[in-house]
Amino acid sequence: MIRFTRYLFVYEGEDGDARLRDSVSRQMKDLDKGIDYDFHAAADPEEALRHVSLYCDLHKDIDTCFVACGGDALTAAVAGGLMGAGEGKTLGVYDPSGTNSLAKYYEGMDFGSLAKLVDGTPAPIDMIRVNNSYAVNACVMGLESMVDGKGLTPSLSAVLKSSFRSVKITVDGVALDTGSVFLFTLANGKYAGGGLHCAPLALNNDGKMDLCVIRNMPPARLSKVLHALASGTLADEPAFAGDYTARRAKSVEVECAKDITLSLDGRPLIGKEFKARVVPSAVRLVVPAE
């Protein structure tokens, strides 16, 4: 059952990724359903957002699935371009590598099969709005020296290089007593960066964010706490209960005397004040058929 008039595959690369285009074209041809599809090679995630938003404005009457073919930053950008576009415009994810955080949220679902994408079902998901930017999965502060292309690497040397921040965090209007903060994660989904399992209990359709604040502590202990955070086991280890604060919230405000950097699904946002809130049922995502 074809649910959309057109599929637009969005990826990064000015000259195009020949292997991606060939793989998509081959799979769509094998489906033999006469599906209308096209490609857009975005220069970067911000250009992808602008293109998707403009496309929605110019083609209001064409039901379109915008398929993000890339990592978290590109996926969030495509989703951001769909804000306010209406039910006829839907987000899809093509993730043959299995590293996309949004795809990893749906355990057991095959986001590498276009046949299952075409037969999939759209479902509403929330997004996080931070100031004027959006995230699908998570916002993270404090991992600048600890994240590589494979996700979190909380080695002792990385911990020693990182600085602690005096940050004021307000959750649904109530200030948290957090003291000096090493990092915090604000999650809509379960993963950040494709590998950081920061919020194993989070739901991306419940109208709330999962906040975890890691306090300042001796480096050796901090390294252990971060390993537990990365593997999604922090809440299961009573010995670490006093090392972090966890809340579920509709809104979170962050203030700092000096500029800090938030990572919004891999896109940096720099400032001293941030206002984050959940946007319920912000976009629809095609969940692949089983």
Where are these regions (language model features)?
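ATP/NTP phosphate-donor binding region
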Residues: 1-69, 76, 80-81, 87
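Catalytic core of DAGKc-family lipid kinases
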Residues: 8, 16-19, 42, 84-185
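Cofactor-binding loop segments of dinucleotide-utilizing enzymes, especially the Rossmann-like FAD-
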Residues: 11-14, 96, 214-216, 288
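Glycine-rich phosphate/pyrophosphate-binding beta-alpha loops
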Residues: 144, 185-200, 268
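Short acidic/glycine-rich loop or secondary-structure boundary segments that cap or lie
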Residues: 144-147, 177-179, 191-195, 219-223
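Gly/Ser/Thr-rich active-site loops/lids in small-molecule metabolic enzymes
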Residues: 152-154, 192-194, 200-223
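A generic structural signal for short beta-strands and their flanking turns/coil linkers
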Residues: 163-167, 180-182, 205-210, 248-252
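ATP/nucleoside-binding phosphotransfer catalytic cores, i.e., glycine-rich phosphate-binding loops
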Residues: 171-173, 203, 213-290
